[in-house]
């Protein structure tokens, strides 16, 4: 959504919505390719999701989030923040 600034001719955009924090460009410096990032983040998001499900079942056999999750934050967003904070080590293969 764009708005026109009253005092100038500049166009002002609303803040972006979606996975923009951390920025994808920063995340790509931590892995070899965008495909590796997608697989790495998806696997970690699955582990986080399994952890939250195991809490509901009373069984704690998975590693939970390594960063403090925000309210209603999705597992993929948590995984991307962990990758950006260098809390996880990515190995090829």
Swiss-Prot record:
Q: Print the keywords alphabetically.
A: DNA-directed RNA polymerase, Nucleotidyltransferase, Transcription, Transferase
Q: Which family does it belong to?
A: Belongs to the RNA polymerase subunit omega family.
Q: Which molecular-function annotations from GO does this UniProt entry contain? A: DNA binding; DNA-directed RNA polymerase activity
Entry EC no(s): 2.7.7.6
Protein name as annotated: DNA-directed RNA polymerase subunit omega
GO biological-process terms attached to the record: DNA-templated transcription
Extract the Gene3D superfamilies matched here: 3.90.940.10
**Can you state which reaction this protein catalyses?**
RNA(n) + a ribonucleoside 5'-triphosphate = RNA(n+1) + diphosphate
InterPro entries of this UniProt entry? DNA-dir_RNA_pol_omega, Pol_omega/Rpo6/RPB6, RPB6/omega-like_sf
Q: Please give the superkingdom of this protein's source.
A: Bacteria
- Quaternary context: The RNAP catalytic core consists of 2 alpha, 1 beta, 1 beta' and 1 omega subunit. When a sigma factor is associated with the core the holoenzyme is formed, which can initiate transcription.
